[in-house]
UniProtKB/Swiss-Prot annotation:
Catalytic activity: tRNA(n+1) + phosphate = tRNA(n) + a ribonucleoside 5'-diphosphate
Gene designation per UniProt: rph
UniProt-annotated binding residues for phosphate: 87, 125-127
Protein name, per record: Ribonuclease PH
EC number annotated for this UniProt entry: 2.7.7.56
EC category: transferase
Molecular-function annotations in GO: 3'-5'-RNA exonuclease activity; tRNA binding; tRNA nucleotidyltransferase activity
Domain of life: Bacteria
Source organism of the structure: Moorella thermoacetica (strain ATCC 39073 / JCM 9320)
Alphabetical GO biological process terms: rRNA catabolic process; rRNA processing; tRNA processing
Stored HAMAP family: RNase_PH
Oligomeric and partner information: Homohexameric ring arranged as a trimer of dimers.
Length: 250
């Protein structure tokens, strides 16, 4: 099959991550994946939800939203609707629990870090881009806390990124854009750590089931894509990258 811009079946779209994108946030990044663009910002609050009070542990949570014209047809703001859609709630929870999986909450202390993910333009893979970009914003915020003496050591235990894989016309492909996603027989989102551990796998067949062998092949391809995404994260984070997984502030 032919893909947009002539990319290969096992090839990511062009990916860039720009740090310090917002002036006031403790951490921020603009991630661009092909024509998908998401601003991810990290905000540190010196408090935790009630269920974590007096535990000495922190919390990571997320919000996600689409700008009205991030999509081909105008998307009504959810504040106007007066409620979050099920899709938005699902994505917010996915981002939050994915990031929590690589943070030592006892090192974070009793504080909350909010990750706000605002989609400027949606062309497939917004949730996976939000996770990949949010990791960079979170790392930036945590490095600032360590530098200020707010936390004793770097709480990040590992890198984290996410990507989509799928079957389109019986071809296994990496990083689906909107058009490919719309025609996919199988669409799967995979979240994985730098050490290759799985955090989340969301896979759905459309029309007919897929085999265990195809599942394994999709996970292997996702692993290749995530390895490339983490290499970009490391390059963008510079010195901060060397402190991820060390549990110290050296």
């Amino acid at each position: 099959m032919l893909r947009a811009n002539g990319r290969g079946l096992r090839e990511l779209r062009p990916v860039t991550i720009e740090r310090h994108y917002l002036k006031y946030a403790e951490g921020s990044a603009l991630i661009t994946v092909g024509d998908t663009r998401v601003i991810c910002s990290a905000t540190v609050e010196e408090k935790v939800p009630p269920f974590l009070k007096n535990t000495g542990k922190g919390w990571i949570t997320a919000e996600y939203s689409l700008l009205p014209r991030s999509t081909k047809e105008r998307t009504i703001r959810e504040v106007t609707r007066g409620r979050l859609t099920g899709r938005t709630q699902e994505i917010q929870r996915l981002i939050g629990r994915s990031l929590r999986s690589v943070v030592d909450m006892s090192l974070l202390g009793e504080r909350t870090i909010w990750l706000d993910c605002d989609v400027l333009q949606a062309d497939g893979g917004t949730r996976t881009a939000a996770i990949t970009g949010s990791f960079v914003a979170l790392a930036e915020a945590l490095a600032g806390l360590v530098a200020a003496g707010g936390v004793p050591a770097m709480p990040l235990k590992d890198f984290l990124a996410a990507v989509s894989v799928g079957l389109v016309d019986d071809e296994l492909i990496l990083d689906l854009d909107f058009q490919e996603d719309s025609h996919a027989g199988v669409d799967m989102n995979v979240v994985m750590t730098g050490s290759g551990q799985l955090v989340e796998v969301q896979g759905t067949a459309e029309g007919r089931p897929f085999t265990r062998e195809q599942l394994t092949a999709m996970l292997d391809l996702a692993g290749e894509g995530i390895e490339s995404l983490i290499a970009i994260q490391k390059q963008v984070l510079g010195d901060i990258a060397s402190r991820v997984g060390t549990g110290n502030d050296k």
